[in-house]
């Protein structure tokens, strides 16, 4: 923490001495566990099983993020959605696709670095928003800022901005690399099977 908290809320016996160590005021809450029938110690023993007890801001920080990466038409969206369904969790669609669909009829199809930065930031913000809804501790992401950086390089041939994109991105717990091991399908938004 950047500074000591002023208040500590707990339902644990160690709450008072813990708060004193930080020079904070302690508030004992629900000691008999009538409102929240689980202790912090029990939650920590099996975080995935008890993830639903966490407040949204804690879910955002503690959920495990699995990100799909790969070329166009490699099944990223299909796999992300199927994994979320199988794991009964949240999945994050690709913001860049929505953005592209929104601008696709412009006469001037040139892109700017600023657009890619906004796409990357929006993708990360969408991940953070949806992470707050996770109930089982896992967030499935169709893409992330790293993939946006690759598209930036493809469209603008600028290879020196990777660290700028990655500054938006918390590294995921797992990248799932989708390979082009089946036929490429044109869905109206894809550019090239190469």
Protein language model features and the residues they cover:
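Conserved lysine of the Walker
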Residues: 76
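A basic- and aromatic-enriched beta-loop-alpha substructure that forms the phosphate/nucleotide-
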Residues: 1, 14-15, 137-154
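A glycine- and Lys/Arg-enriched "phosphate-lid" helix/loop adjacent to the NTP-binding pocket
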Residues: 43, 151, 155-194
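Conserved substrate/cofactor phosphate-moiety recognition/catalytic segment
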Residues: 85-128
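Nucleotidyltransferase catalytic core that binds NTPs
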Residues: 1-64
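Hydrophobic anchor at the beta1->P-loop junction of P-loop NTPases
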Residues: 68
């Amino acid at each position: 923490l950047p500074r000591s908290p002023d208040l500590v809320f707990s339902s644990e016996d160690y709450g008072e001495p813990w708060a004193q160590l930080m020079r904070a005021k302690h508030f004992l809450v629900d000691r008999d566990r009538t409102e929240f029938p689980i202790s912090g110690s029990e939650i920590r023993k099996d975080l995935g099983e008890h993830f639903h007890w966490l407040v949204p801001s804690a879910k955002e920080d503690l959920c495990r993020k699995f990100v799909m990466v790969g070329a166009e038409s490699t099944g990223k969206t299909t796999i992300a959605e199927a994994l979320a369904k199988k794991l009964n969790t949240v999945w994050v669609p690709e913001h860049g696709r929505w953005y592209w669909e929104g601008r696709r009829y412009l006469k001037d199809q040139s892109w700017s670095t600023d657009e890619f930065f906004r796409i990357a930031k929006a993708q990360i913000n969408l991940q953070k928003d949806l992470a707050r809804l996770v109930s089982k501790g896992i967030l499935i992401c169709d893409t992330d800022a790293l993939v946006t950086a690759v598209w930036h390089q493809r469209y603008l041939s600028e290879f020196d901005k990777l660290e700028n994109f990655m500054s938006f991105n918390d590294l995921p717990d797992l990248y799932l690399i989708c390979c082009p091991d089946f036929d490429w399908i044109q869905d109206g938004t894809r550019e090239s099977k190469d």
